């Protein structure tokens, strides 16, 4: 591993420190700091570790026993399977007993650090360093673990087996060789052992890595409970759970130090990391990407990506053997200059986006997909693609085509098109103004459908954004809110890698402006139309909408009820707010650092020495800058926008004129003078002021209005006394949570003049208070704040505002409120609780005007906690929690309360006060009545209503504490964010002062939100987070995020219900006890992204002190009565309580405003229209994407009751409860000669029969492992008679739509073979015996009413009269003979009957078999039936005896079928099939069935592992056989193992099992925005298809119309595609067709290539829509483990194939001659050896080959001519088609009749072609007895099973 820097800080989440420390300095500081400083669990574990047991000092024994020196042995598994053997008898004097924890330490020399604390401390920097080093630098594996704490080996004492003790009495202690290698032990070496306390060796965090499997978080929870909890673990330990789930312990942390072993205590936090994840790499191609490197290398910044960072990342993936799937997307935002192009911009107004720039620059976002889901191991190919796309990216996004018709300009006027050449009109924006949030949102969008098409090999999704910027981005409030909420409900990791040097402020930083509300006539462009601020004006957003108020002017002034809202909005748009998101981890790529690391690994003599500080020769290196470049602006840094001017120096800050507020120039001049005289002007500098205080003032100079000269001292004293009473009670709690730095005299914590409160950026406690409480400075003002309403709610004109009555935008402190939590008027605060999804609602709030302002009486400590005393205010402003989403107050909005006279307001000047911590408010403070009157929060752009005397009297009666709590403990737990914006943005972004942020605040664990428990130690920003980039962490199982009790009572809606186990489960796999039910309910929530809430805070809030010490890995403690457990996810909290009576009470807490506000915003901001270019797309295309941040509401009541066994109320639980769903198909392949070698007994079978035999084998497996509840199992064991296969899959050679149209009544309604036994059982008294039955009587019984079903059956184009199926006769014999107990006995008896001449095979080729074989009664035993040849039904339906499947396209396409639309949509007149079932009532039919399948037959799990298996009832062997799996709470790894075993079984019979998407290919863009089908059109339209050949009277379809897609299907057959699924329009309109998993909704028929790698749909217009099946690659990766399930020598197959030229030795899939030969892909025999890169390229090769053929006019004409001259069945699959190569016959014959030599397999690049010779005819088939062959119909039948190529 390379040297990464002085500190190894590879963690998932990262927030930067305020400045960049020197690397060595930071390393030393880390080494010298106390191990528990900043640790996340000091409160929980601190009592377990005495101060003398420092993690960095030598641990001295705390026991009274002496340390014992013993001889250690090393043994292997042949000696014992136990990892450590300990002979207690040898240590009887120590009193060691089973269960004690023993440590093993190597004996070292006296000079070693073991005996020298001083030397150990001296080597601390080296031994305790977190720097990862490579093997060349530190060859000793123990080099990182030198201290005793790190290198000791721990184990739990177990009794020594007696046989070992007897054979080796001198054995003291022995370890396995694997353990010895980890700890560096040698055999027979001396070691020290000692007894240690479990608390001293308890691990705080454990990193657990896994790969090549999909694990849900519930399985992780169960794995920890089963394999790790309360056990000793060691680094490198292999974990096997249920014999299938495999993981490895990577790192163990004790007090922030890596150790080799530790004890997994109840409070240990497991961190699971996936080494087979899906990575989405976004590369921001902003303007700086083409800038030259400022470090002097001369390369452009993109070279850092392509030559530096990405190769390093891929190499680390390869070194760690990670198997990720990589998607790379280039994205940028292009700004267009309309004036430069001299023509109207050819972009419609819907596709343009106006950013906040002064000139309304139109922009468009571009995305270029480079690779999609490509294996990370082929990184060289990835880099090649990236280089190719980089060459043309700038040209493509900058070029604007000007030939669009009726192109609207920016003002909406359409202009006639001008045929003008493409113009370079665009220019990429800077990284600062890029579309990073939209890109992240797009990448996370598909996670909303993560339960569908589940990848069974990869776990986790991580997004890496590579930007040339420095980590600062200007974003809109809506984008930040929407993206943050989308990430809040999805456990996804996001890493930001910056190519520019790290700035001197906190990063990553998002700049956003106030969500100004626009009028109804304004456009979206006007919404963000104000110019960018040239410099940073406001550094804080903790009081983000509080106007900056000068101290002098703040003392005066009055509250007025009216302000100029339009000017307010304009001024607010200039206010910048800054926030650091919790969900983003930032890294800085410095190529020099890793260049030096590589030199160290290569043992370069000039390389720097590790762990040393290299003094820099120069402190500053000047750089040469080009004047032209500087003038272009490309060299400007984002830091120029982060300057911190004092308010007096704001000459460059321009706002709207202030005349609207009645401010005269003289007033402004007096304001300046008063400001100069203000003693507080320096402490109140803008850099430390909590955000804009005077949004109502249009000029920054307005903030300098004098106000506080005459403030009475009595009022100031009262305010101080009031604050002391309000805030003091929480001082104790504050000090318990985190110590505070002493206040600096020169920088007091709070400097408030009137309405303004100043915070010290140096004070961690005060900073966090104000970050949490946006406008906590609002308290001292007794003003009533009216909720702001929507624009349309008030239409009265606004009252003019005199200069003396301008209201302040934000009061500094808020009066206490007893009835309602305060509504802080901070428009947006990315505070500790983070991001929700909503823009601010239109609410009114207090405003302050500092010009001649006078304070209102401060007698009221309440800020509108309940209903307004003035009913006019209530009537006008009352509203629900879901208010309008308008973000700007309309100018028509005016206060409902009448304007009060100056006499009604008492002047109440104030002085600066200190904010104390408020006491916790009792729950009775929250009054339900408040909710109906006051919306959830207050906005900043609002109107203040001053109090009159009545108001003051009313307020005096409410003197309880403040409405929300400001606490010092950071995080979201004790602080409420009451403005709608705060609630919308909590808990995912935190507002800070980016230029002066306390290190303690940054390293507080509350910064990391839901990811808090993923950090073993505080992260650092100066290095690349390789741990996160190499193996992303899965969302931790636990969290400490929890709201306060008041928030829980006032801001959340509670929905309680109870769940109890179903006493009558009707055979379902349901929990039998409450404890099992509770575990399943917790598991279900964990798998849906919930986290278990632990810690002190939730215990205090809930009053359940047991939660503080809750052991989440021991469910026994959770099952007792009264036990409570909380789980949280985003804004949703669930409380599960075990109550009396065996029930579980569930209470759902849902945030009041999140859903309503989110719903409002979705209507206005969810549509996103970027230009996107997918992999094969020739150009960029606009896409309209709905960025919906809110997840669909999940019905937890239904889900819990479903788990409990109450399932009658759900008609489709898989969709209603969002089951995990995957779909598979079995594709018929051509049989390899070696496959036949394993099927010696079936050599006479053709391919089709072998394929059916494979499906039959699968159905036997399914039946054998069908889930049977224990009660039914006991009943079956007593009645062990006759196992019959109930699946009854019916086979036919036509498509399901034809079957439904022709024989609906007989086959699907009247035929009992689908849902019941095919024959009626004889009474018990009439059961037969083999020994007492005669042949003639048996013949009569079989052909009787209670016998076997006899009917005319068609197979391909042959009609077999009066025959039965072997499967049905086997079942009949089993049920009607007393002495036949198994199907094998029935088959043997059937062969005896066949030998005696009772019946015979219709082709006389087979003996009697249990399967889909046709047999006829011999002529001497045949009974004539009145329906001559009609079977049981009238003659018109007599030919329909065999079912078909939904995946066939055989008879439907053939000339013999009159159904025009078989596997494609009809182009002719409407089709009206002669369906016998035609009736007034619409018939319904189910084409699939569902069964419960047990994926854990060996009972490795501690619960039932059952899935729903949906399978086809009708199947055409020429096409795919479908089955779908769905499950709710089953272990996915067991499902994967089951599917792999099925694949191995099917492979033996020439069937390829492939996972395919559930939805059709054309709908892929709905769930995966970076994918799109590739359209291919025919250059020459095909001629009209041939008239289909009709059958005689036995035909089951009437003459149909010409199939307009005849040639299209023939072309698909030529390129080796088979039908997957039919379009829903192919079925008769009068029949309701459905499947057990739902109704068919395919718009177009879908086909799949035999390799499984490509899907294609045929549109109504005759175009082809191609899509790569990326799911097949995951199955290929899984099949590498196939030898576990199939003991088959694949190497032997490869060798045999090379030397054999068997006619049937054809590789699969066969691509067409146009496609580059890709022989091995898809072949079952060589599946494990397929190169995944070739598999990734296979779809592209197939598609390009197909497109080349379709664009070649000559070949198309030749193809049409030959296909029309010799019409064949258009069923997809090489059927009776002629070939281009005459050496390849078009008809695949059985092995027994094919004798001529075929070309060598590698030369076969196409399985089937339409050119070539006429196919051969099997002579044996011609001689079939009792069969009719129709002349003129192509021969197929049993000749051609399923032409597998």
UniProtKB/Swiss-Prot annotation:
The DEP domain covers: 1344-1419
Q: Which residues form the signal peptide?
A: none
Where does this protein have compositionally biased stretches of type Low complexity? 801-822, 874-886
Concerning Pfam families, the annotation shows: DEP, DEPDC5_CTD, IML1, IML1_N_fung
Name a biological process GO annotation: positive regulation of autophagy
Q: What Gene3D superfamilies is this protein classified in?
A: Winged helix-like DNA-binding domain superfamily/Winged helix DNA-binding domain
Record's compositionally biased regions (Polar residues): 24-33, 969-982
What are its GO cellular component terms? GATOR1 complex; vacuolar membrane
What ranges does the record list as Basic and acidic residues composition bias?
34-47, 755-772
What SUPFAM superfamilies does the database record attribute to this sequence? Winged helix' DNA-binding domain
List the InterPro entries. DEP_dom (IPR000591), DEPDC5_CTD (IPR045838), IML1 (IPR027244), IML1_N (IPR048255), WH-like_DNA-bd_sf (IPR036388), WH_DNA-bd_sf (IPR036390)
The UniProt regions of compositional bias labelled Basic residues, in chain numbering, are: 1-12, 732-743
Region Disordered, annotated ranges? 1-48, 547-566, 732-822, 854-982, 1425-1483, 1825-1845
Q: Which GO terms describe its molecular function?
A: GTPase activator activity
* Membrane topology label: Peripheral membrane protein
Q: Where in the cell is it found?
A: Vacuole membrane
Q: Which family does it belong to?
A: Belongs to the IML1 family.
- What name has this protein been given in UniProt? Vacuolar membrane-associated protein iml1
- Origin species, per record, is Aspergillus clavatus (strain ATCC 1007 / CBS 513.65 / DSM 816 / NCTC 3887 / NRRL 1 / QM 1276 / 107)
């Amino acid at each position: 591993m390379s040297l990464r820097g002085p500190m190894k800080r590879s963690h998932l989440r990262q927030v930067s420190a305020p400045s960049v420390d020197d690397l060595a300095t930071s390393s030393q500081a880390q080494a010298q700091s106390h191990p528990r400083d900043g640790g996340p669990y000091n409160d929980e574990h601190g009592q377990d570790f005495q101060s003398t047991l420092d993690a960095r000092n030598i641990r001295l024994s705390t026991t009274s026993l002496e340390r014992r020196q013993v001889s250690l042995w090393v043994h292997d598994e042949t000696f014992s399977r136990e990892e450590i053997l300990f002979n207690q008898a040898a240590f009887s004097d120590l009193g060691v007993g089973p269960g004690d924890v023993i440590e093993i330490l190597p004996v070292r020399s006296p000079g070693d650090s073991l005996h020298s604390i001083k030397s150990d401390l001296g080597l601390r920097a080296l031994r305790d360093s977190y720097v990862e080093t490579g093997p060349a630098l530190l060859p000793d594996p123990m080099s990182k673990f030198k201290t005793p704490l790190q290198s000791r080996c721990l184990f739990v004492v177990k009794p020594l087996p007696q046989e070992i003790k007897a054979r080796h009495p001198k054995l003291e202690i022995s370890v396995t060789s694997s353990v010895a290698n980890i700890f560096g032990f040698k055999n027979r070496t001396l070691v020290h052992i000692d007894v240690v306390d479990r608390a001293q060796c308890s691990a705080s965090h454990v990193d657990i890595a896994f790969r090549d499997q999909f694990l849900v978080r519930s399985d992780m929870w169960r794995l920890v409970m089963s394999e790790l909890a309360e056990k000793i673990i060691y680094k490198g330990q292999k974990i096997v759970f249920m014999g299938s789930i495999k993981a490895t312990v990577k790192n163990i942390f004790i007090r922030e130090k890596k150790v080799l072993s530790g004890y997994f205590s109840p409070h240990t936090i497991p961190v699971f990391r996936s080494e087979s994840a899906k990575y989405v790499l976004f590369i921001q191609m902003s303007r700086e990407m083409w800038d030259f490197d400022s470090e002097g290398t001369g390369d452009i910044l993109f070279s850092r990506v392509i030559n530096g960072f990405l190769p390093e990342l891929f190499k680390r993936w390869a070194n760690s053997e990670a198997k990720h799937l990589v998607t790379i997307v280039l994205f940028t935002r292009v700004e267009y200059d309309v004036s430069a192009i001299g023509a109207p911009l050819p972009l419609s107004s819907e596709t343009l986006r106006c950013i906040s720039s002064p000139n309304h620059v139109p922009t468009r976002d571009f995305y270029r997909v480079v690779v999609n889901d490509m294996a990370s191991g082929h990184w060289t190919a990835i880099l090649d693609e990236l280089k190719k796309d980089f060459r043309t990216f700038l040209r493509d996004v900058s070029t604007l085509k000007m030939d669009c018709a009726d192109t609207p300009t920016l003002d909406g006027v359409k202009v006639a098109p001008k045929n003008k050449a493409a113009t370079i009109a665009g220019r990429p924006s800077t990284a600062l103004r890029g579309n990073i949030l939209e890109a992240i949102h797009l990448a996370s969008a598909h996670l909303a459908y993560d339960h569908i098409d589940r990848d069974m090999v990869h776990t986790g999704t991580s997004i890496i954004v590579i930007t040339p910027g420095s980590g600062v981005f200007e974003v809109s409030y809506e984008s930040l809110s929407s993206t943050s909420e989308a990430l809040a409900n999805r456990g996804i990791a996001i890493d930001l890698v910056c190519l520019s040097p790290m700035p001197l402020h906190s990063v990553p930083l998002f700049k956003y402006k106030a969500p100004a509300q626009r009028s109804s006539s304004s456009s979206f462009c006007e919404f963000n139309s104000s110019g960018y601020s040239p410099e940073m004006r406001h550094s804080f957003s903790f009081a983000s909408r509080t106007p900056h108020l000068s101290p002098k002017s703040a003392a005066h002034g009055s509250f007025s009820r009216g302000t100029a809202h339009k000017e307010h909005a304009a001024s607010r748009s200039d206010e910048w707010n800054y926030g650091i998101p919790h969900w983003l981890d930032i890294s800085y790529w410095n190529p020099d650092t890793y260049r030096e690391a590589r030199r160290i690994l290569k043992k370069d003599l000039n390389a720097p020495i590790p762990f040393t500080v290299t003094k820099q020769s120069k402190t500053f290196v000047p750089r040469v800058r080009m004047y032209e470049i500087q003038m272009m602006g490309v060299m400007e840094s984002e830091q120029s926008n982060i300057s911190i001017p004092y308010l007096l120096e704001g000459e460059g800050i321009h706002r709207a004129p202030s005349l609207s507020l009645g401010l005269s120039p003289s007033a402004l001049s007096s304001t300046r003078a008063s400001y100069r005289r203000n003693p507080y002007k320096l402490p109140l500098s803008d850099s430390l002021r909590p955000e804009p205080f005077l949004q109502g003032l249009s000029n920054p100079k307005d903030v300098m209005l004098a106000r506080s000269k005459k403030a009475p001292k009595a009022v100031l004293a009262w305010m101080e006394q009031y604050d002391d009473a309000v805030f003091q009670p929480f001082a104790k709690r504050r000090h318990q949570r985190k110590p505070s730095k002493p206040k600096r005299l020169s920088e007091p914590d709070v400097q408030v003049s009137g309405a303004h409160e100043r915070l010290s950026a140096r004070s961690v406690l005060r900073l966090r208070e104000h970050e949490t409480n946006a406008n906590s400075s609002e308290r001292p003002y007794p003003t009533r704040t009216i909720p702001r309403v929507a624009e349309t709610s008030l239409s009265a004109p606004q009252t003019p505002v005199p200069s003396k009555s301008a209201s302040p935008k934000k009061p500094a402190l808020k009066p206490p409120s007893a009835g309602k939590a305060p509504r802080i008027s901070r428009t947006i605060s990315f505070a500790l609780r983070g991001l929700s999804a909503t823009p601010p609602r239109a609410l009114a709030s207090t405003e302050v005007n500092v010009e001649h302002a006078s304070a209102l009486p401060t007698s009221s400590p309440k800020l509108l906690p309940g209903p307004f005393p003035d009913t006019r205010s209530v009537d006008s402003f009352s509203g629900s929690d879901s208010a309008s989403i308008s973000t700007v107050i309309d100018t028509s909005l005016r206060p409902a309360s009448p304007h009060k006279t100056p006499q009604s307001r008492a002047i109440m000047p104030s002085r600066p006060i200190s904010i104390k911590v408020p006491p916790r408010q009792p729950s009775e403070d929250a009054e339900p009545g408040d909710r109906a009157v006051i919306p959830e929060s207050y906005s900043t752009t609002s109107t203040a209503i001053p109090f009159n005397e009545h108001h003051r009297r009313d307020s005096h009666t409410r003197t309880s504490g403040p409405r929300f709590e400001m606490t010092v403990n950071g995080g979201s737990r004790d602080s409420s964010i009451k403005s709608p914006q705060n609630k919308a943005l909590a808990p995912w972004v935190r507002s800070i002062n980016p230029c002066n942020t306390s290190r303690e605040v940054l390293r507080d664990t509350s910064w990391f939100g839901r990811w808090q428990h993923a950090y073993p130690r505080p992260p650092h920003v100066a290095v690349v987070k390789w741990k996160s980039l190499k193996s992303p962490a899965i969302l931790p199982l636990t969290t400490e995020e929890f709201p306060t009790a008041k928030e829980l009572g006032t801001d959340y809606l509670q929905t309680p219900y109870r769940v109890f186990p179903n006493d009558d489960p009707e055979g379902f796999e349901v929990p039998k006890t409450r404890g099992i039910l509770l575990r399943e309910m917790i598991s279900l929530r964990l798998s849906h992204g919930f986290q278990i809430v632990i810690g002190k805070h939730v215990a205090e809030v809930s009053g359940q002190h047991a939660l503080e010490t809750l052991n989440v890995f021991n469910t026994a403690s959770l099952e007792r009565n009264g036990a409570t457990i909380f789980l949280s996810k985003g804004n949703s909290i669930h409380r599960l309580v075990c109550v009396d009576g065996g029930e579980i009470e569930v209470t759902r807490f849902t945030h009041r405003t999140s859903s309503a506000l989110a719903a409002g915003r979705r209507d206005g901001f969810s549509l996103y229209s970027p230009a996107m270019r997918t992999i094969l797309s020739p150009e960029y295309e606009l896409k309209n994407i709905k960025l919906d941040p809110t997840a669909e509401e999940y019905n937890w009541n239904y889900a819990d009751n479903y788990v409990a066994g109450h399932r009658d109320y759900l008609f489709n639980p898989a969709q209603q409860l969002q089951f995990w769903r995957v779909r598979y198909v079995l594709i018929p392949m051509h049989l390899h000669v070696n496959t036949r070698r394993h099927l010696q007994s079936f050599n006479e079978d053709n391919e089709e029969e072998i394929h059916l035999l494979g499906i039959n084998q699968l159905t036997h497996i399914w039946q054998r492992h069908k889930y049977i509840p224990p009660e039914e199992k006991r009943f079956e064991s007593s009645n062990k008679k006759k196992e019959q296969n109930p699946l009854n899959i019916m086979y036919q050679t036509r498509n399901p739509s034809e079957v439904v149209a022709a024989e609906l009544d007989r086959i699907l309604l009247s035929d009992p073979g689908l849902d019941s036994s095919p024959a009626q059982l004889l009474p018990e008294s009439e059961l037969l015996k083999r020994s007492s039955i005669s042949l003639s009587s048996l013949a009569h019984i079989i052909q009787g009413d209670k016998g076997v079903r006899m009917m005319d059956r068609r197979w391909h184009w042959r009609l077999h009269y009066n025959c039965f199926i072997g499967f049905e006769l086997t079942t009949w014999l089993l049920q009607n003979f007393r002495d036949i107990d198994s199907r094998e006995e029935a088959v043997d008896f059937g062969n005896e009957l066949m030998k005696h001449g009772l019946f015979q095979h219709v082709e006389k080729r087979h003996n009697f078999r249990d399967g889909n074989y046709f047999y006829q009664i011999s002529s001497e035993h045949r009974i004539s039936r009145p329906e001559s040849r009609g079977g049981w039904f009238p003659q018109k339906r007599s030919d329909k005896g065999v079912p078909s499947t939904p995946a066939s396209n055989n008879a439907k396409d053939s000339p013999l079928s009159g159904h025009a639309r078989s596997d494609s949509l009809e182009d002719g007149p409407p089709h009206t099939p002669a369906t016998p079932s035609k009736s007034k009532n619409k018939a319904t039919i189910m084409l699939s069935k569902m069964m419960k399948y047990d994926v854990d037959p060996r009972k490795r799990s501690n619960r039932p592992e059952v899935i729903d298996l949906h399978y086809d009832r009708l199947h055409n062997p020429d096409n795919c056989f479908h089955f779908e799996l769905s499950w709710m709470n089953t272990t996915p790894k067991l499902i994967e193992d089951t599917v792999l075993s099925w694949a191995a079984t099917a492979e033996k019979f020439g069937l390829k099992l492939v996972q395919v998407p559930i939805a059709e290919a054309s709908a892929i863009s709905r769930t995966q925005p970076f994918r799109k089908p590739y359209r291919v059109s025919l250059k020459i339209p095909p001629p009209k298809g041939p008239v289909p050949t009709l059958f005689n009277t036995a035909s089951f379809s009437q003459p149909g119309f010409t199939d307009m897609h005849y040639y299209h299907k023939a072309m698909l057959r030529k390129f080796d595609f088979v039908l997957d699924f039919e379009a829903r329009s192919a079925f008769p309109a009068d029949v309701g067709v459905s499947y057990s998993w739902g109704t068919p909704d395919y718009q177009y028929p879908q086909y799949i290539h035999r390799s499984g790698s490509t899907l294609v749909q045929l549109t109504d217009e005759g175009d082809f829509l191609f899509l790569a099946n990326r799911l097949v690659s995951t199955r290929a990766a899984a099949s590498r483990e196939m030898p576990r399930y199939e003991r088959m020598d694949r190497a032997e197959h490869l060798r045999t194939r090379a030397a054999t030229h068997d006619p049937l030795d054809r590789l699969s899939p066969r691509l067409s001659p146009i496609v580059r030969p890709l022989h091995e892909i898809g072949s079952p025999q060589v599946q494990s050896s397929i190169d995944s890169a070739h598999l990734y390229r296979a779809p592209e090769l197939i598609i390009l080959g197909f497109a080349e053929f379709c664009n070649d006019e000559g070949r198309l004409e030749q193809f049409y001519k030959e296909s029309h001259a010799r019409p064949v069945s258009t069923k997809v699959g090489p059927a009776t088609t002629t070939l281009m190569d005459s050496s390849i016959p078009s008809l695949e014959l059985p092995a027994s009749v094919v004798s001529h030599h075929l070309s060598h397999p590698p030369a076969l690049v196409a399985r089937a072609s339409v050119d070539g010779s006429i196919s051969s005819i099997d002579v044996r088939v011609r001689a079939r007895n009792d069969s009719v062959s129709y002349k003129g119909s192509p021969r197929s039948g049993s000749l051609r099973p399923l032409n597998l190529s």
